[in-house]
């Protein structure tokens, strides 16, 4: 039997649990295109305009708003209504003078929170690769790649960025404004698990080789808990480097 290509439909009952939308009013919803964020951790732009921000009554109106270039994501006009918008992305509507940052609430649901810093964004380093010339390419959580030029690839002191660290970058220019290392004592935002949406201090990092690293944290109530490194997004020292 021949291949039928990628899936194009998504039933509401099968939509990711992070999506806060009525499940039984209609049968289908918008399926996001493959992109910078996984479907389980992002929302298509159409749902943000129609269901979250309530700027449209139906899909047709939402598409029209998007196609007219009225919506910006990370400082760039986006005209694809199925574009996946995920964690830390900035959604802007210049005509309404409104800016929102995508975060998770205490139940793990995707929420848009008004932001006072729409020109910067926090990005987690997911991976690093060495490219031609010995320069370092940082692969960030939102699909971005930033190349760090090094004068001498043999000098380890020039390689200051590690996986798990966080960068504060300008958008859309991608200029690095600040670097927050993943280390004990840093403030972290929890992106998954039982404590999703919480802020907590890193107390201990347990390196486990081929197994996921375990991080011990302490929240603002003094409660200690453990989670995997993938769920830990460092955001500052005593306070987040930008308001979240």
Curated annotation (Swiss-Prot):
Q: Which SUPFAM superfamilies match?
A: Alpha-L RNA-binding motif
Q: Which GO terms describe its biological process?
A: translation
| PROSITE patterns the record matches | RIBOSOMAL_S4E, S4
Q: Can you list the GO cellular component terms from the UniProt entry?
A: cytosolic small ribosomal subunit
Task: Check the record and name the InterPro entries matching this protein.
Answer: KOW, Rib_uL2_dom2, Ribosomal_eS4, Ribosomal_eS4_central_region, Ribosomal_eS4_central_sf, Ribosomal_eS4_KOW, Ribosomal_eS4_N, Ribosomal_eS4_N_CS
Gene Ontology MF terms: RNA binding; rRNA binding; structural constituent of ribosome
**Can the keyword Ubl conjugation be found in this entry's annotation?**
no
| Protein name listed in UniProt | Small ribosomal subunit protein eS4
What is the species listed in this Swiss-Prot or TrEMBL entry? Methanocaldococcus jannaschii (strain ATCC 43067 / DSM 2661 / JAL-1 / JCM 10045 / NBRC 100440) (Methanococcus jannaschii)
The gene coding this protein: rps4e
Q: Which HAMAP family match?
A: Ribosomal_eS4 (MF_00485)
Q: Provide the alphabetized UniProt keywords.
A: Ribonucleoprotein, Ribosomal protein, RNA-binding, rRNA-binding
Q: Where are the transmembrane segments?
A: none
Q: What Gene3D superfamilies does the entry give?
A: 2.30.30.30, 2.40.50.740, RNA-binding S4 domain (3.10.290.10)
**Family indicated by similarity:** Belongs to the eukaryotic ribosomal protein eS4 family.
Domain S4 RNA-binding: residue ranges: 43-108
């Amino acid at each position: 039997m021949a291949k039928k290509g990628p899936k194009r439909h998504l039933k509401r009952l099968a939509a990711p649990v992070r999506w806060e939308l009525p499940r039984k009013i209609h049968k289908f919803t918008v399926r996001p295109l493959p992109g910078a964020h996984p479907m389980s951790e992002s929302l298509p732009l159409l749902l943000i305009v129609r269901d979250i921000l309530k700027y449209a009554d139906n899909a047709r109106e939402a598409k029209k708003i998007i196609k007219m270039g009225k919506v910006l994501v990370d400082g760039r006009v986006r005209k694809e209504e199925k574009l996946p918008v995920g964690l830390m992305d900035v959604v802007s509507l210049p005509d309404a003078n409104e800016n929102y940052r995508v975060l998770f609430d205490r139940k793990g649901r995707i929420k848009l929170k008004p932001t006072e810093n729409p020109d910067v964004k926090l990005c987690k380093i997911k991976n690093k690769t060495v490219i031609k010339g010995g320069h370092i390419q940082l692969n960030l959580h939102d699909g971005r790649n930033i190349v760090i030029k090094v004068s001498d690839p043999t000098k380890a002191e020039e390689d200051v960025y590690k996986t798990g660290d966080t960068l504060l970058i300008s958008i859309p220019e991608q200029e690095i404004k600040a670097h927050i290392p993943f280390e004990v004592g840093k403030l972290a935002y929890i992106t998954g698990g039982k404590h999703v949406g919480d802020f907590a201090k890193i107390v201990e990092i347990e390196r486990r080789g081929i197994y996921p690293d375990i991080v011990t944290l302490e929240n603002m109530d003094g409660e200690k808990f453990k989670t995997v490194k993938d769920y830990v997004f460092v955001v500052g020292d005593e306070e987040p480097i930008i308001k979240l």
